Amino acid sequence: MKLLKVSRERRQTLYFLAISRGIPAITVMREIDVSRIVAGGLQRSMTAITIKAISEALRQFPQLNAMIRFGSDSTLICPDNISTRVTLEKVLNGVSGVYSRVISNTDRLSVADIERALQQFKQEDAATSEHYEKIRLIQRLPPLLAGLLLRLAMLSPTRQAETWGSFTMTSLGKNSPDACIPISGSTFTFTLGLINEKLSRNSHDVAMSHVANLSMIFDHRVLDGRLASEFLAQIKSNMEGFALESSS
């Protein structure tokens, strides 16, 4: 047996998990019929479509575009725009780690605009991109100092809002499980499970549909279960009623 330290290229995950640890999170889940999206050949844009559907739902529930201020249990930060934090897996020095980027005004962007941003994020090099410069610095610092600096940064409401976004969207790619419940740092964190085929029956016939589980992890300090269920139902309605022409 031997003891090893966690690779410094993954330290940012440890620090963000430490910040998120105290959030009283609850998970709710709905099955989404994505048959129209699949029929339109837009499976590759599923993450962008989901982000758009959530952003539009958040615009319909503006009181939910809020987060508890770091270090407080009763003060809300209410951002001026709807933004999406996206997590990505990147390799730095041969070590795979989780990184994140934020897209602003996702309720105003088209699905195509969101998809272009996602593709740009995927192409960025964790070793050279200026967007990950602060993360690389944190990775190099002694753990105690890095953790302290991150916590100090979160004391700024503006920095906190810019870091976490209105919600987080995380995806595990083509090998995604049917459902995933991650630890949440944002007020909301969403994951879309693997798309599966399912027999659906109605009064006329039996048809094959495509479905996926959408998990929503939310901060119970910001909202209660009933409102969370209504919010998730609106997201489901937005996704299932997705207009194919809106992706262009």
Task: List each model region and its residues.
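C-terminal catalytic/motor cores of large multi-domain enzyme assemblies
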Residues: 1-248
